[in-house]
UniProtKB/Swiss-Prot annotation:
GO terms for biological process: tricarboxylic acid cycle. Keywords: FAD, Flavoprotein, Oxidoreductase, Tricarboxylic acid cycle. This is Probable malate:quinone oxidoreductase. The keyword Flavoprotein applies. The gene is mqo. It comes from the Bacteria.
Length: 525
């Protein structure tokens, strides 16, 4: 009997060993690094385009959407350039450049179509759980700023995408739009505002959770939480060997081979990209800027304000510094956020290491980062000013947008880290970029997303662009073309300038997502 038990034990041990070896040497079609909105979006696209592909997702936290995608770690703005004045700079001749605003708006229309398709197919659930109509407003004071906003509004009316926007310099009208902004304000102050009813508040954390929840029902998808990617190296057959540490087992490391790797790890993407050794990654650096918000959950205050009210950013400051007073729907409640206020640490992630910035330095990015530091005095000045702010200073900033605010109603909340891109530049040595950028190997076998703004709002178009880059041949096939046009009905077409298409697409997404809709009319002289 003892011999039989020993034999059974040995066979079981052998079986476990064989299974571990198989796991150690397994090859999958796709590895997604990071459990945020970007990886969730790409994973969803790929599952719908290639249902038989095997996909592994690795996330270092014990849940998805715990970093920048979490609803509390970002402003939740569905960035459409309705209110964000940094997307419409004034040119030297005094005219307003709306080209960036059009691009941002077109991008968000793609996101709306992607989410609508997922709702129709029960991938995403009740739309109200993740997106709600909240008017987007621009608000300014002072003669120069009022003149700028007046010109901005006029310029945007030449685009079909911004028709339906309202403009006013009348205090009573603006008070109807945003009473908290006007109550207690000096009646002699010259003010102006625009209001776009098509604005939205989006909870990207909820979207991420719902996308990943659906993916986990697919036997070809495997979610690995509390797993940290430590290394990425190319194999002889041009696949990638990804080394992963299981944080629930004292960091025990295993490897997985992948035909394609996406690095969507937010602020941690740069250091992982550097480990790949691909020449395309050389010269990239990163600069982390954190954010804090003042928050009130007092329903008596929150229920008086239904808008995202954007002001003007300080000269030289990053886009994420634009002050705004926002209606948010978080954890089933309506709350107000004001900010952001910049913070600085060496961390690339909210739950990262203080040494992240130091570890990212290399011989290829040291000079670009040095040049950026020397050439961006306005940014340095802005950050120093922000870091010197105390509670009274932050409250004074809030009172510029909410004159009758009471300090006792507000608390300070630390949001996520925004890691800005620094690129090598032949002319200037280094450039600081505030957007997002896909960096991929020449053969398309690995890609990373770097940068911050506009970020999550444009996850669907960014991942679409990534697929067009790394799966170029696949995207060109009739099968992928047909499916992509099913997911994104406007795929291959620009909405700007096409009134019929704009109304058709917005009517469709507004209906599915239960959002406000305004029919676009021809431009009036």
């Amino acid at each position: 009997m003892r011999k039989i038990l020993v034999l059974i034990f040995c066979l079981n041990l052998f079986g476990v060993t064989q299974q571990a070896a198989a796991e150690e040497n397994k090859t999958v079609d796709v590895v997604l690094i990071g459990g945020g909105i970007m990886s969730a979006t790409l994973g969803t696209y790929l599952h719908e385009l290639e249902p038989n592909w095997s996909i592994d997702m690795y996330e270092r936290m014990n849940g998805v959407a715990e970093e920048s995608s979490n609803g509390w770690n970002n402003a939740g703005t569905g960035h459409s350039a309705f209110a964000e004045m940094n997307y419409t700079p004034e040119k030297k001749d005094g005219s307003i450049d709306i080209s960036k605003a059009v691009v941002v708006n077109e991008s968000f229309e793609i996101s709306r179509q992607f989410w609508s398709y997922q709702v129709k197919n029960n991938v995403l659930k009740d739309p109200k759980s993740f997106i709600n109509s909240v008017p987007h407003m621009s608000f300014v004071w002072g003669d120069d700023n009022v003149n700028f906003l007046r010109k901005r509004y006029a310029a945007l009316q030449h685009s079909t995408l911004f028709r339906g926007m309202e403009y006013s310099e009348d205090a009573n009208q603006i008070k109807q739009w945003a009473p908290l902004v006007m109550d207690g304000r000096d009646p002699k102050q010259k003010i102006a505002a625009t209001r776009m009813p098509l604005g939205t508040d989006v909870n990207f954390g909820v979207i991420t959770h719902q996308l990943v929840d659906t993916l986990t029902k697919n036997p070809n998808f495997k979610l690995n939480l509390s797993h940290e990617v430590r290394d990425i190296k190319r194999n002889d057959d041009n696949t990638w060997r990804v080394t992963v540490a299981d944080l629930t087992r004292d960091g025990k490391e295993t490897t997985v081979n992948a035909k394609f790797v996406f690095i969507g790890a937010g602020g941690a993407s740069l250091t992982l990209l550097q480990k790949t050794g691909i020449p395309e990654a050389e010269g990239y650096g990163a600069f982390p800027v954190g954010g804090q918000f003042l928050v009130t959950t007092n329903p008596e205050i929150a229920n008086q304000h239904l808008a995202k009210v954007y002001g003007l950013a300080s000269v030289g400051s990053p886009p994420m510094s634009v002050p705004h007073l926002d209606t948010r729907m978080l954890d089933g409640k309506r709350v107000l956020l004001f900010g952001p206020f910049a913070t600085f640490s060496g961390k690339f992630l909210k739950n990262g290491s203080l040494f992240d910035l130091l570890h990212s330095l290399s011989t290829s990015n040291l000079m670009p980062m040095t040049h950026v530091g020397l050439d961006n005095f306005d940014l340095v000045k802005y950050l120093v000013g922000q870091l010197m702010m105390n509670d009274d200073d932050r409250f004074a900033a809030l009172k510029e947008y909410f004159p009758e605010a009471k300090q006792a109603d507000w608390k300070l909340w630390t949001a996520g880290q925004r890691v800005q891109i620094i690129k090598k530049d032949d002319e200037k040595g280094g450039l600081l970029q505030f957007g997002t950028e896909v960096v991929s190997a020449k053969d398309g076998s690995i890609a990373a997303l770097l940068g911050a703004s506009p970020g999550a709002s444009t996850a669907a178009p960014i991942m679409l662009h990534l697929m067009e880059t790394v799966f170029k041949d696949k995207v060109a096939t009739p099968e992928w073309q047909s499916k992509l046009k099913e997911i994104i009905p406007s795929y291959g077409h620009k909405l700007n300038g096409d009134i019929e298409m704009t109304n058709k697409i917005r009517g469709y997404t507004s209906s599915v997502l239960q959002l406000d809709y305004i029919e676009v009319k021809p431009e009036t002289n």
